[in-house]
């Protein structure tokens, strides 16, 4: 699984 944060 990949996690990311949109800035």
Swiss-Prot record:
Lineage: superkingdom: Eukaryota
GO CC term (a single one): extracellular region
Major place of residence: secreted
GO biological process: neuropeptide signaling pathway
Keywords tagged on the record: Amidation, Neuropeptide, Secreted
Subcellular location: Secreted
Modified residues (Leucine amide): 7
Function as written in the Swiss-Prot or TrEMBL entry: FMRFamides and FMRFamide-like peptides are neuropeptides.
Protein family: Belongs to the FARP (FMRF amide related peptide) family.
Protein name per its UniProtKB record: Extended FMRFamide-1
């Amino acid at each position: 699984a990949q996690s990311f944060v949109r800035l």
